[in-house]
Amino acid sequence: NPNGYFVDGPVLDMKFKSGIGMFPIPIAHGLTVGEFAQMVNGEGWLSNKVKCPVTIIPVANYTHDMPYTLPVKPSPNLNTQQSILLYPSTCLFEGTYLNHGRGTYFPFTIIGSPPLRGKYEFSFTPTGIKGMSETPLFMNQLCYGLDLRNYDVAELRKTKQINLQWMIELYKSSPNKEQFFDNKLSK
């Protein structure tokens, strides 16, 4: 887990269980796959309290503070180490009216919307990208906002917490505060 060095974020309310969130864990859970499997078994979270067989293969000298780069991208929209490390902080933008980089080759590292014109210099135009995001929010519209591609993720490692400052900044800059959050964020 590249973000295995910290635990932070809201815990899923199980009445909002979906294919995206299936278990009551925080956004940044800090677990290895083996630890997560043991937790699922131990808490009886599988249907009918089924237990899955788990074999743990220890990694010599592993600690949760060790930097780790995934050998394979976990999702077409988590295609860089930067996006993976920023994801616990930027995934919350999926519950807003902002485009969070879908429809670009930089998902979860750039965030913006057309109404932020004049408030930010950085801009991007989401387009349909087969296999990534074919109908992104604000498709073919110029969006203005934040570019986090060069953000020093070592800062996240220092604080060991989700960065909410970007959400606060973009909310304050938004001319549409009453429409900023969609109903997904309350779930």
What are these regions (language model features)?
Residues 112-187:
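Conserved functional hotspot residues or short segments at active or partner-binding sites
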Residues 61-142:
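Glycine-rich, aromatic-lined ligand/substrate-binding cores of catalytic
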Residues 2-15:
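Glycine-rich, charge-decorated loop segments at or immediately adjacent to ligand/cofactor-binding or catalytic sites
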Residues 1, 59-61, 113, 151:
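Active-site-proximal beta-strand/loop segments in catalytic clefts of secreted hydrolases
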Residues 51-54, 105-107, 145:
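Extracellular structured ligand-interaction cores
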Residues 17-90:
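Conserved anion/nucleotide-ligand pocket segment
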Residues 3, 35-43, 96-100:
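Noncatalytic linker/hinge segments flanking ATPase motor cores
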Residues 31, 35, 105, 119, ...:
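Conserved active-site and cofactor/substrate-binding residues in soluble primary-metabolism enzymes
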